[in-house]
């Protein structure tokens, strides 16, 4: 059973009415009216304003808070899972920038549904949290899953200050678990559907930022399909859960487009798995709460995307179109008509249907987000998607509606008639006409869906051709730039070749100059060697001359000494013997004939006089001699 809710993005009301926001008018708590503006495609086609009325289980105006949304659409799902252990699903639908991610997650001061749901779960199981032994028991039982601790991913993560409601609020909305023989464990997993491939957001990406794509596999105990190999993280408190969600939001693929500054490029599926374990028998049961943040549909013209972003947008639109077709087929099946549900055309619908959500095995709430000041055509298309599930909606929450069906009006008017049989006949006729009109409307809807599908296929082909043309233009431009780069490189190489030749010529000249200088140096070395040899020879000759001069000096000294001794002897004789005696007795036989000393000849030495520095000192020449009085000589 699907319930559809509508949330209007925060905006200021128009000046003419307090309940009118752009092209949207909130009629009451469950109905809105869309009025096409003049710049819309619908206005240009019809050449006048078009009015579209849509009904929902509940309409949230822009003034509603995050807690209001949680209390209405998510709190009943959480309570059902806690009490009855039923699987539940909440997914958002809307154009890019309509506020889907804000509703599910939100900032820390206005936390979204995901944070409030976890806070409510931990409040309900407070005092009944799983012990370490229970956690190990579950790990052993869930062998096919990758069970990891939250601390593996939260090293170095800063704590988050999430503003959550007080305990009085939870006490009034959720039952407190009082069963003493049961313990509860909460596991979180995060899957991303990007370009129709499933990835685990908690898997560590490679060096190039790639992750391993996962597949869907059937469970051994049921026909449900689950994501094989995805990591399930055990969280023991809200702090770990909040940090884990914050880390995942940073890893999710997003970019900036013209229509949305932070546009999600993938569908995010956050799974909260609640395990209930009996401590006595070790039996356990589980339920799964899935929160799905669908990427927003966008038009290429308004988003101005190209290349990779264009392919991402086309993949998102294809998966959303398949989801709309599945909802339409589910509506027809609910009416008793045999219709094939094309859920295998997209990984998103295959996961939602095979997990038991859209097949009627779980409670489903769908939240449609609308931007009243955005594109009318895109938001109207989202309204048509949500209309596919109207036939399986429960009655609106507000039963005091001002509008009544024609059959009801007829019954009111026929109270005063007395013919009950005629009234019954007329009522059967109206029911037949109503059935025929329903069949005609269903056929018209089918034709419109087929026409829309053909138009979208044609637009897709045209867009692919446009993308191919853009790629060809880009490749042509790239080749031209490459050719210019090659030409520029050739010119540079040619200039470098000229410079190299010039440098080689200069190098040759310098090499010759170096050879000449080396030859001159060699000649100088030869001259230096010859000069050294001459110097050695001159030094040897000088040494010989010095030696000869020393010998001559010693000889002269010896002769001078002999002369001095002879002079001293003569002087002594003169003192002892007078000169007359010496003169008178020349012929005496008794006396010795002493000849007079002949004058000493001056010996001229052929040796050059020594320089003062080389002349021996007089003390060395006259050492050992007797002092002689020159006057006496």
From Swiss-Prot:
The places in or outside the cell where this protein is found are: Nucleus; Cytoplasm, Cytoskeleton, Microtubule organizing center, Spindle pole body; Cytoplasm, Cytoskeleton
State whether keyword Coiled coil applies: yes
Q: Which UniProt keywords apply?
A: ATP-binding, Coiled coil, Cytoplasm, Cytoskeleton, Microtubule, Motor protein, Nucleotide-binding, Nucleus, Phosphoprotein
Q: Does the keyword Nucleus apply?
A: yes
Q: Which residues form a coiled coil?
A: 417-541
Q: How is it modified after translation?
A: Phosphorylated by cdc2 and dephosphorylated by clp1. Dephosphorylation is required for the interaction with ase1.
Compositionally biased tracts (Low complexity): 604-623
Gene3D superfamilies (alphabetical): Kinesin motor domain
Positions where Phosphoserine occurs in the chain: 605, 611, 613
Name the GO terms of the biological process aspect. microtubule-based movement; mitotic sister chromatid biorientation; mitotic spindle elongation; mitotic spindle elongation (spindle phase three)
Where does it mainly reside? nucleus
Look up the record and report any one GO term of the cellular component aspect: spindle pole body
* InterPro entries listed in its UniProt record: Kinesin-like_fam, Kinesin_motor_dom, Kinesin_motor_dom_sf, P-loop_NTPase
Q: Where is the Kinesin motor domain?
A: 1-392
Q: What does this protein do?
A: Kinesin-like motor protein involved in anaphase B spindle elongation.
Q: Which family does it belong to?
A: Belongs to the TRAFAC class myosin-kinesin ATPase superfamily. Kinesin family.
- Output this protein's name: Kinesin-like motor protein 9
